[in-house]
Structures are given as structure tokens and as C-alpha cells.
Amino acid sequence: DWTWDEFADVLIGVKQYMVEQGMCGENDYIWSDMWCGQTSGYGQGGNLLKLLGASYDINTGWAITTNYGLVYDADSDSFVDGSVSDKYKQAYTVLQKLVQNKVLDPETWTQDDDTALNKFYRGETAIMSTNRAQYAVQDAKVKEQLGEGNYELYRILTPIGTSDYQAENQRLECGIMISSNALNALGEDEFIKMMRFVDWLWYSDEGLTLTKWGKEGETYTVTDGAYSLTPGYYCKGLSIGQTSDDQVDLREELGYACGNFMYSGNTELLTSNLPENLRDFYDRHGQYRQLRTPEPAGNPTKKQK
């Protein structure tokens, strides 16, 4: 576990070591991230600024549009403008430190995601953002470029800024919202049937297992509590890589393991697709990070807007 300042110091040391070993030059950067530039950053700094901001209790990057940029302060039960706070200055001071010491590549904010990924695959950079779906792809590509046994990937926790909270506390991430027009369109009896189906599909163990893994015996099996796909399938969305050319992606081919379904359920189901190293990552989250108080519905004043 570490703070952003400590993390920056470690990366400065890693850069120095890589220079000494001839792995990179003084003017090279060892961190050139994806999800921040022209492909998916939307001109807002994307994922990296979102994670950095969450560590300092501010909304920035992808989160800048959340509640008009306002942050919920549970202690005062009010929304505050994080962009004028000392926390905002602290977050961007760390960012400046990383750039000035030639650790974080300024091209992070302008390059496309493929450019960032290819730098990582070739071993030119040492750190990269990831998620459950992307990790299997990244691992396979690094192995293809560098060769098995010539590298090691390790998931780190997002460093601590002014809090040890996990990143997300918004009420909307994955799920379903139903318009009031549905009742008018379907009538009461059919509307009740639909709501019963929705309740089963999104909130029962059986429905969530179906939407995540498919049909037991056909797309997956369970042995001693361990879930695995049948030989004909792989799934990038579950971080289960392709091992033969005749396999098809469970999500792309059949629509299972889609994000709007699969991020809820009991702990056993939530972790059923995780390899050992990712289970360790989640265990460390539970040990070192706290859950934020959920935000109430935002209702900013005209002046705040």
C-alpha cells in the first residue's frame, strides 16, 4: 500500500534503474497510458485523471461530468466544488511531479489507445491502466512480443491521496432504468410480468449466473465450486483468453458476460471468473481500501450549475 507521492518516488527510482540498465534513455517515459487521449479520453484526461481525482476526493477526468463536477462530502452532507479545493492542487502537484521527472508521458493526453498499448507491449513502458476485460488481452500481447518468462504483470491498488476510498461511489454504473411510459404501453398486468422478469434477471443468483456464464453444460461447467468455460469458448470480458483458433468469444458470439449484467451478485459469483492473481488484487482492496458513502441524488443550485 502507498500514497501517490510514494508511488511517484518509486516510479522515479524505476526510471533511474531502467536508464542504468540500458532499458531506456533519460528522455524516455516509462508510463504512457491509454484511455486518456484522443480515442477515449474525450479531452478530459479520461481514466487516469478519474482515478487520481477519486483518490483526492475530487471529480476530474471521466468523472468531471458527475454532478456537474461537484463532490459529495458525507461529513457535511453537502456537495462541494472540488476544483477550488486544496485537494485539487495536491492531485495535480503529483501529476506534475510525474511529468517533470519524465515518468509520465505527456502524449498520454493526446495519443490514441493503440499507440499507448503498443509501447507497453514492446516493453518500452512499464506501467499501464487495465481492467478485468483488458487484462487478458494485454497479457497475451506482451507474451507475443516479449516471450513467455521474460516479463511479469502485477496489478497494483490505486495509490492513496487524501483518502483510502475505492474509486466508485456513484449510484449509476451498471443496471437498468425503466421509463414510466412502460406502464402505459404494456398495461398493469404485462408491466408486472416484465418487472418480475427484470427482478429475476438482474437480482437473482440464477439470472445473474445465466447472464454471466451462459447455460451450464453448454457454455460452462462447475467443478468443486470452480467455474470454467467449455472448450469451444473464451471470453475477453471475463479475462479468459483464447487458447485455440476454433474458439469463439462468449460475449461477442452469444451476448453473455456483458457489463450491464455481470457486476453484481454474491461474492462467489462476482469472483467466479477471477484467476488467482486477480483474487489477490480484490483481497488487497478489501484489506487496504474503504467503501465511500453512496452519493445522494445530485440537486445543484442554479449558481452551482
Model-inferred region functions:
Residues N59-D86, P159-Q166, T221-D246:
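Short, solvent-exposed loop/beta-turn-alpha elements that line the ligand-binding surface or hinge
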Residues C36-S40, A133-A136, I160-T162:
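Solvent-exposed loop/turn segments at secondary-structure junctions
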Residues N169-E173:
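Short, solvent-exposed loop/turn segments at the edges of secondary structure
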Residues R196-Q304:
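Conserved small-residue motifs centered on glycine
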Residues D1-G46, Y68-T115, K119, I178-I192, ...:
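Helix-loop-helix "hinge/cap" segment bordering the ligand-binding cleft or interdomain interface
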Residues Y42-I64:
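Conserved oxyanion/phosphate-binding beta-strand-loop segments in alpha/beta enzyme cores
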Residues Q138-D164:
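Ligand-binding "clamshell"
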Residues R122-Q134:
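Alpha-to-beta junction loops
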